[in-house]
Every structure is written in C-alpha cells, then in structure tokens.
Amino acid sequence: MCGIVGYIGTQTAVNILIEGLERLEYRGYDSAGIATVTEGKIESVRAKGKLFNLKEKLENHSNFSRLGIGHTRWATHGKPEEHNAHPHLDNQQRIAVVQNGIIENYQTLRDQLKEKGYQFYSETDTEVIPILIADILKDLPSDDPDEALLEAIGKAVHQLEGAFAIAVLDAHCPEQLIVARQQAPLILGFGQGEFFCASDVTALVHHTTTVLSLENGEIARLTPLGVEVYDFNLKRVRKLPRTLDWSATTVEKQGFRHFMLKEIYEQPAVVRTCLATYLNEQWRAADHPSHSPVFLGLDPQLTKNLQHIQVLACGTSWHAGLVGKYLLEQLAGIPTTVHYASEFRYAAPPLTPHTLTIGVTQSGETADTLAALEMEKQRRLTLEDDYKPLILGITNRPESTLATMVNEIINTHAGIEIGVAATKTFVAQVLAFYFLALDIAFQRHSLSLEAIEHIMVGLRQLPAQIETILEQQGSAIEALAHEFAETQDFIFLGRGINFPIALEGALKLKEISYIHAEGYPAGEMKHGPIALLDAKVPVVAIAMPGSVHDKVISNAQEAKARDARLIGVTPMDDSQARSVFDDLLLVPHVEEMLSPIVAVIPLQLLSYHIAARRGLDVDQPRNLAKSVTVE
C-alpha cells in the first residue's frame, strides 16, 4: 500500500520520481504527488487519481531540481482528494514529507500543534509530521541547517506512535534527503554519485541493484556524497549494502498484455527454480539415505519434537496455508491449524508446547501477519523451554521485515510479482509447504522412504505439466471466458486438499473481475449455497482423481439439477467428468496429493481472461494493494 520514492544526485529528479512511482503502481493508490527543492523553495505538485493526472500537471512545470520525493497514496485518513495527497508541507512551506503507514497518535499531536497556532489543510495523519518537524526546528540553532534537520527529525520520530516510513525535504537543505523507518518498509539504493530511497526495490532496479534495507528505528541521511545511517538516538550505525539478483527486465511485461498473464506463464520456471534449490536430485530411497531429501537449511531445533504447527497468514497466503495444513498433517503427521493473522491477535488460542508458528506473506511486510507473529513471540519469550517461540517465515522477499523477526525463513524464489492478484507466488508458497512437510516426514519417519521418493518424482513432473496446461488450454480457456463477461455470480467447489483451491479460484475472480464469487467445500453446498443456484450462476468444481473424486462429481450433479452451468477442473482422461460437466478446464492426471498446483492454473487463466474481456485493469484492480502494510 502506498509508495515512496526519493532521489538525490546528478539527474533531473522529476523524471526519476515519476518513473519510480510508475513501478510502484501495482501496490495500489488513489492519488499521487512529488516535491522538489529548487532555489531555496519547495515545489510540490499533487493530483487525485492515476499518475497520468500528475504527469499532465507536470507538463506545465519546468523543474530541473536534482533532489526530490514522490508518493502514491492509498487513503486511510481522509478521502482520496488532492488536498489529502502527499507530499505534505509545514505552514511555512519549508518542510515536505511523504509517509507510508499510520500515525496512531496523530490526533493528539494535531491538537497540540493547533494550540500553538499551526493550521492544518488536510484530513491526513501525515500532515502532523512536517509541522512537528518545523516546530522543533524553530528552537534549534540555525547556523548548520543540515545538522538541525537531522536533529529535528530525530526528536520528531520519538513523538510518533504507529508504523511509518518517511522521507523528508528541507528547502534550506538542497543537498540532503532524510528518511526514517519504523514498522514500514524502506529501501535505499546506491548509484554513482546518486542515491535513492523507495518503499519497494521494484522502483530501483532500473537504476541500481545495490541496495540497503533500513531496519526499524533507523534514520538515513542521503547526500550526493553518500549515505549515513543512524538509530533514532542519532548514533551512527554501520551497515553494508547488498546486491540484488534481479534485473530491469523482471519488472517489464516482455510482450504480455498484462503482468498477471506474464506471471501465470512464469510458473513452470518458478517451480523448476524451487525444485532445483530445495530438492536433492541424488536422493534415492534404495540407498537408504540418512539425510533428508530436502535442502531447507533450517535449524534442526526448529522442527525437533514438534507437537503442533500454527500458520498465520492473510488472503492468498492463507489459502496456501490451508493446503499446507493438509500436507503437514497427512505427510508429517503433525496437527496444524491455520489462522487469519488479522483475527489471531484478538483471539489467540491457548498456548501449546513444542509449537512451530509459520508466518506466510509474499512481501514479508503484511502488517497483520507481522503483528500476529510479534505477539506470539512476545507471549512465549518468558516461558519455559517447551513453550519457547519457534517461528518460521515463508516469503518471496528474504530482505523483508519478516526475515528480521523469525528464527528461519523459506525463500520462495518466485521473483518480483507485479500483478496485485497473486499467481506465481501462491504456487511457490504451496511448494514451500511440500518441502517442509517432506523434510519433517523424513525426520519423524511418518512416511516410508519409498513414499517420499514417489512424491518427489511427482513434484519434478509439475513444471512440464503446468506447461501442458498453458500450451494446450490457454486459448480454449480464453474463448470460454468470453461467455462469462456479463456473469454476476460464481460458485467454486472443492473437497479435501482442493477445497483451498476453490477458495483461491473464487478470490482470484472477485479480485480482478469484480464478479461476486464464493468458494465452498463441495459437501457444504447443500447446507445453504445451493439456494443461490439457477441458470445464471455457473459452478466451478475441482474434480481431481483421488479419495473425494466421486463425491465432487455427485455434488456437481446436484448443482446441475438446479440448472447451474457446470465447469469442471478435471484430468484429460476422466470420461466420467466429461459426461457431467458442461465445460472442461482440462489438466494432466496427477496424484491427489499433488493436484492443487495443477488445479489452480486453469482457474488463474479463467479469472484473468474474464477480467480482460470485461476491459478491466487486471494488474491494478480497484481498492486493492499488493502489499498491505497497515492493519
């Protein structure tokens, strides 16, 4: 949610700021703005709506400043209007601030500053920050404006409560950009005589792959000569940048109409990368190996003597966690519960001993998930060893906040995902649960070596099977999608390990097509949802081979008896399904335990093509953000 970009260097700042904000559009926003320092003054331009509106306004401005900050805003405090857009300035137009996050005590600060005579012109929490900094500055020595600004920001951040990342300009400091982070992501980029800041590395990769992630409670001063990092008490902190393994092409469409479609087609490569990274190619059951077939690199103490696993996640990551529950229980034999992170904090279950807590978030910055993990850690810290916090993160961003607060992480290696609707990162998260379940199963001897090898063989076949779906079904699914462009409601059904896939299919459709869609366990249809069915409500049923196949077919026939149009996700060789379903989303024949990854692919394609047919913004659906960094 929201996006920050900052620049100081030798190039025209406006161009870099706009380009960076365009790279952050996928995070979701409803207004945008920039501020630069020119001849001792702050120049600020803001606009409601898309960046196109801001760019139109900038066409009438000649601005060659080499220092600036930019922001895309997702409304939290105050409506999405121009006067609420960032940057916000103090009353003297000296200080400009952009901010991500929420200042929880903004009303108290606002009231205090109003009593001092300051005026407020927006409804946002952010506006208190530049006014607070300016208020502190007036009482500091003015002989060195650069040092005074740093000191004022150091004092100001101690008064701010909540999660925030800020970037600050001072009209009196044309060679300095100061940023601060507390519970909201902020990345610094290093170039040749130029430096950048952004809320996500996607804004930086076209300019540099040398980056540094600020941690909570840190301030950074960027000048044309370099970067200095301090803690909130203004003590210097020594930090070293790292090099990203991403290239500029990873944030381009490369010939695809939308990023989402590109990312769907990247899934075979993502699965191959995960398999090559984590599965031991040489492992054979016949060799009676003494080592795990999976290279996760986890501390053995993390999974030793486990009695319970709890998964905390939101949205699509929660669906991946539900698949993980089946795998961890069926393969590793460990009771597993899956919680919405946003609910866990307010109704946490009783503490159980020898419990592994897994936080799943593709960005590593999902506020609800991080807060739930932190709460779980804190309530276990002072307890005896049996209850000590054992926390694992599953994320696509190993440099994220999540990685700093857990014992270990599993990197899903999916690469940058620009489309708001998760596709390849979901598949990568599910794979992470396969690897974890197999690793624990080997350690606990809950599966025979032969059974483990059988699953590994199936996993290695997945990339080619996904390619088969994309190559053989892509055009057919696109044609089918055209028939549902005016549909108002969908029902998705699944059982067992594919019930979460029904939920995921429904979520994908509603996210990007704005069609009301719900996922249900197939056996629950008769307990309420069947009342919704008629000829106008298509039903998508996931009927994969295995223990629940016949039950799903039976449930589908109940829907057909109510005139619903039936769409089946089913193997190419399933003659029974062909006789029941009106339309088929065909997939290769796979083992039931491996079916979620192949079953989800046609549902992604169906959702994409319906949304595209409706002429919608597939990559940036309304009201949604890629990374939800506020609670």
From Swiss-Prot:
Major location (coarse): cytoplasm
Active site: C2 (nucleophile), K626 (for fru-6p isomerization activity)
Domain Glutamine amidotransferase type-2: 2-225
Lineage: superkingdom: Bacteria
Species assigned in the record: Synechocystis sp. (strain ATCC 27184 / PCC 6803 / Kazusa)
Cytoplasm among keywords: yes
Catalytic activity: D-fructose 6-phosphate + L-glutamine = D-glucosamine 6-phosphate + L-glutamate
Cellular location(s): Cytoplasm
InterPro entries: GATase_2_dom, GFAT, GFAT_N, GlmS/AgaS_SIS, GlmS/FrlB_SIS, Ntn_hydrolases_N, SIS_dom, SIS_dom_sf
Keyword Cytoplasm attached: yes
A Pfam family reported for this protein in Swiss-Prot or TrEMBL: GATase_6
Biological role stated in the UniProt entry: Catalyzes the first step in hexosamine metabolism, converting fructose-6P into glucosamine-6P using glutamine as a nitrogen source.
GO MF entries: carbohydrate derivative binding; glutamine-fructose-6-phosphate transaminase (isomerizing) activity
Protein name: Glutamine--fructose-6-phosphate aminotransferase [isomerizing]
Coiled coil (residue ranges): none
